[in-house]
From Swiss-Prot:
Subunit structure: Homodimer. Bile acids promote the assembly of inactive monomers into an active dimer and enable catalysis.
Top EC class of this enzyme: hydrolase
GO annotation terms (biological process): host-mediated regulation of intestinal microbiota composition; N-acylethanolamine metabolic process; N-acylphosphatidylethanolamine metabolic process; phospholipid catabolic process; positive regulation of brown fat cell differentiation; positive regulation of inflammatory response; temperature homeostasis
The organism of origin for this protein: Mus musculus (Mouse)
Binding site for an N-acyl-1,2-diacyl-sn-glycero-3-phosphoethanolamine: 188, 321
Alphabetically ordered keywords of this record: Acetylation, Endosome, Golgi apparatus, Hydrolase, Lipid degradation, Lipid metabolism, Membrane, Metal-binding, Nucleus, Phospholipid degradation, Phospholipid metabolism, Zinc
GO molecular function, one term: N-acylphosphatidylethanolamine-specific phospholipase D activity
Name of the featured protein: N-acyl-phosphatidylethanolamine-hydrolyzing phospholipase D
Xref: PANTHER family: N-ACYL-PHOSPHATIDYLETHANOLAMINE-HYDROLYZING PHOSPHOLIPASE D (PTHR15032:SF4)
Disruption phenotype: Knockout mice are born at the expected Mendelian rate. White adipose-tissue specific knockdown (effective when differentiation of adipose tissue is complete) causes obesity, adipose tissue inflammation, insulin resistance in the liver and profound changes of gut microbiota composition.
Cofactor(s) for this UniProt protein: Zn(2+)
Biased amino acid composition, Low complexity: 26-38
Cofactor detail note: Binds 2 zinc divalent cations per subunit.
Main location: Golgi
Length: 396
């Protein structure tokens, strides 16, 4: 993708309750064309104890969001400098395209050649890894993306900052029709300005954006009209597909895009609950008690997308980035039948060797008595289909 500039200013069948709309004061009324809004619909009816045990989002005295668990430690400037200056970087990404093609091949996604084949009806779920935390998920007659990142750099500028060493498997113009996009948080490797502009240019107001609390204004300044902003445990749906519920669920991370906007935007994960399939997207996260809460409330999931990379050194990264063993613990807490690895093999964002995450994942799976089919790795551009009737996987 060409250069972009970010201005910065700018299971069973369920019975759902009636919807309650809460608009921000600066939101445009639906009749005026924009459907961007704060929207909340109370989640499924739960027993009282579980409802009380759910962790809600919290703000500090300065009005900024905070992580509410003892598993979190705030990131300090001295520790950032210690990491950048004192720690050795072992990422070892080769400069040779031939070697990268051998170790991390980029496949042409099936839908580039056969766009009419995209979409899964009734029982079944298909996931395609497009690099880093970007997935195309097809389930319950919907197609949606997670944290779309198609640019060359995860940075405010396409001239500097972390550069991807594996190209996107496809362009935005080669995607099939996308119904929705899920955004987990506002870091540059997960909320990419150029990708947002390109997706909005192609799909316009037909594309529904699900974003965390605090991100609505930024999305509107990008020209996106169909934006739904949610707090933890709030839910919404795509118009015409009200049997599939998108719930914004917790994670342990942080947000920042400019010098002074630390944690003014919430971060989180996504639970997508349909009549045939259930999918979970962790986004970017450290290990925390939230995943057990999510598993108890919405599990078992058919498939979870869990990060396994950007984890070294542990003294610094463990609070914000799960390592492969943490990822397996998250897999277990979520009560998910299968998981797919994300957040590795695309950008060198931490100090582990670029090929280490899958190796460490398989070692952790063996320690926990799980197999590589329980928590699997995809090549860039590769798809896997899950029949949610008999749980049998097929590669494409």
């Amino acid at each position: 993708m060409d250069e972009y500039e970010d201005s910065q200013s700018p299971a069973p069948s369920y019975q759902y309750p009636k919807e309650t709309l809460r608009k921000r004061q600066n939101s445009v009324q639906n009749s005026g064309g924009s459907v961007s809004s704060r929207f909340s619909r109370k989640s499924f009816k739960l027993d009282y104890r579980l409802e009380e045990d759910v962790t809600k989002s919290k703000k500090g005295k300065d009005g900024r969001f905070v992580n509410p668990w003892p598993t979190w430690k705030n990131i300090s400037i001295p520790n950032v400098l210690r990491w950048l200056i004192m720690e050795k970087n072992h990422s070892g990404v080769p400069g040779s395209k031939e070697e990268l093609d051998k170790e991390l091949p980029v496949l042409k996604p099936y839908f580039v050649s056969d766009p009419e084949d995209a979409g899964v009806r009734e029982a079944g779920l298909r996931v395609t890894w497009l690099g880093h935390a970007t997935l195309m998920v097809e389930m319950d007659e919907l197609i949606f993306l997670t944290d779309p990142m198609f640019s060359s750099r995860a940075s405010p500028s396409q001239y500097m900052g972390p550069k991807r060493f594996r190209r996107p498997p496809c362009t935005i113009s080669e995607l099939p029709t996308i119904d929705a996009v899920l955004i987990s948080h506002n870091h540059y490797d997960h909320l990419d300005y150029g990708s947002v502009l390109a997706l909005n240019e192609r799909f316009g107001s037909e594309l529904r954006w699900f974003v965390p609390l605090g991100l609505l204004d930024w999305m509107q300044k990008c020209g996106c009209e169909n934006v739904i902003e949610l707090d933890w445990w709030e839910e919404n749906c795509v118009p015409g597909h009200d049997k599939v519920t998108f719930v914004f669920t917790p994670s342990q991370h942080w947000c920042k895009r400019t010098l002074l906007d630390d944690n003014k935007v919430l971060w989180g994960s996504w639970s997508v609950l349909g009549p045939w399939s259930r999918f979970f997207f962790a986004g970017d996260t450290g290990y925390c008690p939230a995943f057990e809460e999510i598993g108890k409330r919405f599990g078992p999931f058919d498939l979870a997308a869990i990060p396994i990379g950007a984890y070294e050194p542990r003294w610094f990264m463990k609070y914000q980035h799960a390592d492969p063993e943490d990822a397996v613990r998250i897999h277990i807490d979520l009560q998910t039948k299968r998981s797919v690895a994300i957040h590795w093999g695309t950008f060198a964002l931490a100090n582990e060797h670029y090929l280490e995450p899958p190796v460490k994942l398989n070692e952790a799976l063996e320690r926990y008595g799980l197999s590589c089919e329980d928590f699997f790795i995809l090549k860039h551009g590769e798809s896997r289909y899950l029949n949610t009737d008999d749980r049998a996987f097929e590669e494409t």
